[in-house]
Amino acid sequence: MAQGRSCVHPQCSTHSRLHWTQINGTRLVFSMNPAPRRAPIILYLHGGPGDACIPLTMRYNAALERDFRFINLDQRGSGLSYHPFAPDEAVTIDSMVEDVRQFVLGLLRGYGQDSLILIGHSWGSVLGLEMVKRYPSLVRCYIGLGQVVSMHAALRLRQNWAQQHLGPRIGSIVSGESGAADIVLMINELLSRGGAAMLFGSMGRIMAYLRSPYYNWPRLLNHAKGVSQSRARLDAELEQVDFSGQTSFGAPVYFISGRYDRHLPGSLVERFADGLKSPHRFIRFERSGHCPQWDEPERFAATVKAICL
């Protein structure tokens, strides 16, 4: 495991540094703050596929470092873990879940703990909920942000909404997983949440990458390549994901959904949560879109602390 330097930009209050580890034949980079050995561990799984976000959690979620060991893992082939996928390299949901499992086991061994807190956002919520399904003993609790429940159902709702409000042409664009769909939905979420003010606010997320001590232009290019290759390998499988038949989990699950989330409508998540027989809770953030952890970071930090401490 190797350390990098901490974020020194004046708008960053993070104490996290970069580390790396070797998992299943690939080098994975992650951020982690110094913390007491017995501090509760949070592992954050980014969205995408491939949309690594260490600069964003450093900028917006550093408040969690006061009470937790907060770790954000750049997944295989993504962000600072970028490498070109080999033609025969296994890049599937199963292989990505196995990467996460091996990473979790290493953390728990290293810090003498039995389980940790998982946070999964969007695509990362697929990996997170699969971890809870398959390995509940490793998960103290799970928090899903922009949770994937049934991609088929989400895409139908997304298309119907877009055709009604934006017209048939836009409806066809957002009916599948693609970069174009993400852009259309993101712009609409921003406008719905307050128009120009929110749009200018979103520039802060772009600046988080441009000002990060860990990103330069070649690494930004690699980030884009990581998104592209991850989508090419995983989007088709992602569109088949369906947790709607699951009625219980072996660890408590919490779902945070933004009122204006056009990517993965909260109505599906709330209905899914209502049908669970195991411990769960659905939480709606009224001022958020698809990224409640960055749209309302103060409320997000307070909510995580209330759930986990």
Predicted regions and their residues:
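A catalytic-pocket lid/entrance helix-loop region that shapes and gates access to the active site
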Residues: 139-179
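The serine-hydrolase catalytic nucleophile loop
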Residues: 50-61
